[in-house]
Amino acid sequence: MIASYLPSILVPLVGLVFPAIAMASLFLYIEQEEIS
């Protein structure tokens, strides 16, 4: 039963959370480069 519910949780997680983390890390990297 858990396996059938897993994609409905995993797809939004990868589609929304991962890009948000990537954007945030990229933003912080650019900010550090400008400051230093």
From Swiss-Prot:
Pfam families: PSI_8 (PF00796). The keyword Aminoacyl-tRNA synthetase does not apply. The keyword Thylakoid applies. Keywords: Chloroplast, Membrane, Photosynthesis, Photosystem I, Plastid, Thylakoid, Transmembrane, Transmembrane helix. SUPFAM superfamilies: Subunit VIII of photosystem I reaction centre, PsaI (SSF81540). It is found in: Plastid, Chloroplast thylakoid membrane. The chain crosses the membrane at residues 10-30. Its main location: plastid. GO terms for cellular component: chloroplast thylakoid membrane; photosystem I. GO terms for biological process: photosynthesis. It comes from the Eukaryota. It is a single-pass membrane protein. InterPro entries: PSI_PsaI (IPR001302), PSI_PsaI_sf (IPR036357). May help in the organization of the PsaL subunit. Belongs to the PsaI family. This is Photosystem I reaction center subunit VIII. It comes from Mesostigma viride (Green alga).
